[in-house]
């Protein structure tokens, strides 16, 4: 398989852009080189490496990396509450908070919004996933949930992936009002969730560390909200109160250092995904989306 640049659609303009990727050379080695694949399975996917790097990025000296990272990744710091010099470590910077009003949230009760900043793929029917990325192995909801009954509940449902790159805002939020459950944690590995990694094996989502909660809603049914760990993600922190009422746009939690993914799973016939996102997904290209931005409607 050839190594390709990661391209995506800038939704506001329709322009095709190339993503700036941190550690692109390493990703190429790990997922496209036979020796790299050996290293990936022997070391890189393991918890100890992500834990070690997470601790390293929490040390005071790590803050020296912030300025160059911001410049290289062209991050607009005017959107955030604190300036570069205020962060105690790179990790402190990594889960930085937005200023109030930095993201426009669509509060129309009939629409659902993105839980995070990132690149989105959406499958109106979960069965469509196998057509796009999986080769030689099948993605199953039973493995993903690690629960046969829940897999049955969401059979033929809708599957939405929001991939967060390292340069993105790394807090995630509720996509609609509802009642949120406690967190269920599923142990797993720490593979990268970059587009390069997913193209080689979509089942990474069934193998990585992940946790989920069920958001019970009035108009969109019971939404399974997954937060997925990845290479170098030191942890997933949930900041919400379990078994409570939540509002669209309220913070749910954040990822520590690394890139990672939020996945929403809907029951069958509960949501209609926006046409542009479906078309881009069918063309195997992600769409840029921001927290609070609409990606679908209630199915009437």
Curated annotation (Swiss-Prot):
It is an enzyme of class 4 (lyase). Keywords: Cell membrane, Decarboxylase, Lipid biosynthesis, Lipid metabolism, Lyase, Membrane, Phospholipid biosynthesis, Phospholipid metabolism, Pyruvate, Zymogen. Binds 1 pyruvoyl group covalently per subunit. GO terms for cellular component: plasma membrane. Is synthesized initially as an inactive proenzyme. Formation of the active enzyme involves a self-maturation process in which the active site pyruvoyl group is generated from an internal serine residue via an autocatalytic post-translational modification. Two non-identical subunits are generated from the proenzyme in this reaction, and the pyruvate is formed at the N-terminus of the alpha chain, which is derived from the carboxyl end of the proenzyme. The keyword Cell cycle does not apply. Pathway: Phospholipid metabolism; phosphatidylethanolamine biosynthesis; phosphatidylethanolamine from CDP-diacylglycerol: step 2/2. Belongs to the phosphatidylserine decarboxylase family. PSD-B subfamily. Prokaryotic type II sub-subfamily. Heterodimer of a large membrane-associated beta subunit and a small pyruvoyl-containing alpha subunit. This is Phosphatidylserine decarboxylase proenzyme.
């Amino acid at each position: 398989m050839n190594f390709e640049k990661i391209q995506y659609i800038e939704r506001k303009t329709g322009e095709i852009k190339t993503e700036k990727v941190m550690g692109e050379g390493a990703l190429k080695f790990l997922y496209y080189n036979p020796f790299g694949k050996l290293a990936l399975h022997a070391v890189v996917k393991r918890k100890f490496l992500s834990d070690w790097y997470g601790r390293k990025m929490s040390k005071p000296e790590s803050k020296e990396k912030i300025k160059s990272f911001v410049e290289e990744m062209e991050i607009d710091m005017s959107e955030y509450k604190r300036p570069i010099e205020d962060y105690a470590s790179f990790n402190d910077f990594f889960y930085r908070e937005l200023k109030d009003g930095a993201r426009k949230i669509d509060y129309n009760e009939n629409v659902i919004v993105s839980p995070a900043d990132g690149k989105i793929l959406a499958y109106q029917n979960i069965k469509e996933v196998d057509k796009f990325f999986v080769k030689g192995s099948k993605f199953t909801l039973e493995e993903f949930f690690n629960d046969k009954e829940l897999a049955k509940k969401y059979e033929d449902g809708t599957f939405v992936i929001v991939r967060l790159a390292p340069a993105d805002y790394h807090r995630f939020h509720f996509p609609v009002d509802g009642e949120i459950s406690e967190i269920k944690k599923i142990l797993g590995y720490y593979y990268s969730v970059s587009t390069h990694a997913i193209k080689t094996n979509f089942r990474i989502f069934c193998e990585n560390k992940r946790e989920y909660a069920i958001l019970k809603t009035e108009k969109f049914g019971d939404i399974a909200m997954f937060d997925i760990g990845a290479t170098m993600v030191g942890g997933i922190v949930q900041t919400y109160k379990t078994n409570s009422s939540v509002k669209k746009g309220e913070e749910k939690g954040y990822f520590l250092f690394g890139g990672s993914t939020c996945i929403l799973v809907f029951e069958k016939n509960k949501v209609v995904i926006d046409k542009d996102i479906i078309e881009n997904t069918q063309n195997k290209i992600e769409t840029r989306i921001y927290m609070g931005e609409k990606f679908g409607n209630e199915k009437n």
